[in-house]
Amino acid sequence: MCGIITVFGEERDVPTDLLSHRGPDDYRTETMGKCRMDFYRLAINDLSAAGMQPFVRLNRMFMCNGEIYDHRSFRSGDERSKSDCEVVMNLVHTIGIENTVKSINGDFAMVYTDGKRVLAARDPVGVRPLFYTRYAKDSIAFASEAKALVFLGTRIEIFPPGHFYDSYVNTFICYHTGYWNVHKFSGTKNHERIRHILEDAVHIRLDNTDREIGFLLSGGLDSSLIAAIAARKIGRIRTFSIGLEGSPDLEAARKVATYLATDHTEVTFTVDEGLRALRQVVWSLESYDTTTVRASTPMWLLCKYIKENTDCRYIFSGEGSDEILGGYLYFHNAPNVDEFACENMRRLHLIHQFDGLRADRCAGAHGLDLIVPFLDKNFIQCCMEMNQTLKMTKLEKEVLREAFKGYLPDEVLWRQKDGMSDAVGTGWVGALKEHAEKMMSDRMFEITQGMCKHNTPLTKEEAYYRELFWVCYDARNDHLISEIWRPKWTTVTDPSARLLIEKNPK
């Protein structure tokens, strides 16, 4: 988790400290020809000065915010560091950008230049963030977060996942289409294969850091499985959970921690602490989406605690499973397998705007590197090629639960899906709605609705988050969230998992 800024074309003065929260360990700026690169380092792999970026070699310069998990297989012996990212510069130079991004297994947002031409690329599902803006003729800028491009004063856009950019043709080119073919579902249920691929995804990530490792543990299926796999591999691990006093997540996480014999830390927060953090959370997220803000606030507070009280900087989390396996409760309402499959792919396609965004920004706000094994490209491929009818089960993600029998206590392994904003404590979502009612008069709500041509808020809570977003980024950036996250095939518009259960009990 680092911060990168690139300005290519007309020269511009780039303010410093724009992304120091993402990369608090070091900062460097380099210029080659028409290209300037600014790098904010969070040292994870090769902590020495040799691992500092941008990497500059004769007539080429490169930087990458990311992790390349199979970097050892690409080493030529000419590298000057042990950094997992340095090998990518040599690959781009020898085999080209398209062949490089198709070959590597990693989470990345990268930029390469020879001073006359700039190339940029983002991983297939957008685990690592990247934005761009065209600020002048034949000029383009890239950055890890939208806030780092605001100074240029031009429209900011999301760099599309699974694409690379080439200034020679001045366009974005899709290099990855493997997950998006609705007719490409012929696989069978194979518990051993699912287990092996996910375990491998965790193991290669455990082996890719020189920093102390931690695990976010909500007590739900996904984060608990990641912790269980890691504990079997490396022994005693360090886990962290957060919730309001007496919350379901804290209780469930405690059971998992005891079962796995982890070094466990519980962090409690109050409603007032959460409400006070909202403006900072929205600034960090660059989002006004309701479920994202609700779930991000406790996660943001937990990451803040980890940064301030531990040496853990390489943090595992469980995002991605619901998007890959159709794990959200509203998927039970899918009328047929075709619609289930299409919505499954749509959720994965948009993860970089919702759960993926939450994971990256909450950790990045506090200089932590968040690792998401469920979004390993091999695991995604395995699950998306599966016969989709195998995902349409009475209890969500049964195929995953069955593959990992014995890894967790049964009451956790077979625990029903609960949204993070619900499970951190029954009072949290209610308190947010009540707070929004106090902050937004009926007239103010009406005015805000009228100002929102895109993603018009349906509730005062949604309008309140939009107002907080405007304080940080103004209405010109509303388009950075393509839609508000809402369940499908139901009259419920609130994203709360508990409301879905109450409205559509099994």
Language model: regions and residue ranges:
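Short glycine/proline-rich, acidic loop/turn segments that cap or connect secondary-structure elements
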Residues: 169-173, 433-444
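Short, surface-exposed acidic
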Residues: 26-27, 79-84, 407-419, 445-448, ...
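ATP-dependent adenylate-handling active sites, centered on carboxylate activation for C-N bond formation
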Residues: 8-10, 116-119, 124-130, 134-136, ...
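Short linear capping/connector segments at secondary-structure termini
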Residues: 177-181, 416-423, 449-452
